[in-house]
Amino acid sequence: MKNKLPPFIEIYRALIATPSISATEEALDQSNADLITLLADWFKDLGFNVEVQPVPGTRNKFNMLASTGQGAGGLLLAGHTDTVPFDDGRWTRDPFTLTEHDGKLYGLGTADMKGFFAFILDALRDVDVTKLKKPLYILATADEETSMAGARYFAETTALRPDCAIIGEPTSLQPVRAHKGHISNAIRIQGQSGHSSDPARGVNAIELMHDAIGHILQLRDNLKERYHYEAFTVPYPTLNLGHIHGGDASNRICAWCELHMDIRPLPGMTLNELNGLLNDALAPVSERWPGRLTVDELHPPIPGYECPPNHQLVEVVEKLLGAKTEVVNYCTEAPFIQTLCPTLVLGPGSINQAHQPDEYLETRFIKPTRELITQVIHHFCWH
């Protein structure tokens, strides 16, 4: 029953107080099971049907889908339940205690983005879900901050095809319809060690990597020349050499060298296309030194994303907000949800607060966010 639902600020407080950190390091990684249970119980109290989905390949992580209404289409509101780890020495407040001060709500996940579920639940107090003409879905995912495993698995397995979706990442309530993707690779070269007094008796991995880097930088230039999307601040795919290590002593021929790099592709560029371009760029080195160069993914790749600018979702949201949709450089789960239906990224709080100590959400977002959620539910589920 709706009268069992706690007040907005108490929902927010409970979400922040329930740790759900995602990390690649096992010692820091946490299950989101307790948070999913909280959300599931609240949505059941509102009359939703709730399904909890274990996410394979994770450390006890779950998705939750709450649904109400019948028929095809409808609206999907989505967000992730996890947060990044926190640096205790840089926080001046308890990350797991919601603190209100000077027009701000402080806590880990206030902006990015557990707080979004408090807004949804609060808005639903005034919605008679028994009168919806189209279904309403609420999706809570796992592991967005690391592998995006929750959104990937949900998109791969669901038969759901809503009319549209909104992901409540912190965009300062400015609608986002496109972003770049992210691919990170390790280029590894196996040389042959030996004494530096006789270089010809070994294979210097640093020298081979020097050759490989030349070809990678040529690929960077080619990407800049061939691909353009003028709406982006940086209107071409970027390629960055981020980390390199090789060798262990000045008097030894280097037997191993490793380079970490990333590419941020534009919407419309496929992951297979990018992998092909990278492998083609490195082919001269691989052919000259068979078996010595490998390319491995550091993280699961994220494709670029774009919602059609003429879709009804874009038109409706732009009219409601009085603001045009934007494109951004950071990544979200939108590429995976977009495989199900046209998707926008739109939520309270600033992306500048994401992953920061003393993360906060400004209270000025509370009223307009609640109103926006109510309006989009009315438009897409009642009309």
Swiss-Prot record:
As cofactor, the record names: Zn(2+); Co(2+); glutathione
Q: How is the cofactor bound?
A: Binds 2 Zn(2+) or Co(2+) ions per subunit.
The keyword Signal belongs to this UniProt entry's keyword annotation: no
Signal peptide extent: none
Major place of localization? cytoplasm
Q: Name any GO cellular component annotation.
A: cytoplasm
Give any GO molecular function from the UniProt entry: zinc ion binding
Give the subcellular location: Cytoplasm
User: Kind of enzyme, top EC level?
Assistant: hydrolase
Give the pathway annotation: Amino-acid biosynthesis; L-arginine biosynthesis; L-ornithine from N(2)-acetyl-L-ornithine (linear): step 1/1
**Biological role:** Catalyzes the hydrolysis of the amide bond of N(2)-acetylated L-amino acids. Cleaves the acetyl group from N-acetyl-L-ornithine to form L-ornithine, an intermediate in L-arginine biosynthesis pathway, and a branchpoint in the synthesis of polyamines.
The similarity comment for this entry is: Belongs to the peptidase M20A family. ArgE subfamily.
Name of the protein: Acetylornithine deacetylase
Gene this protein is translated from:
argE
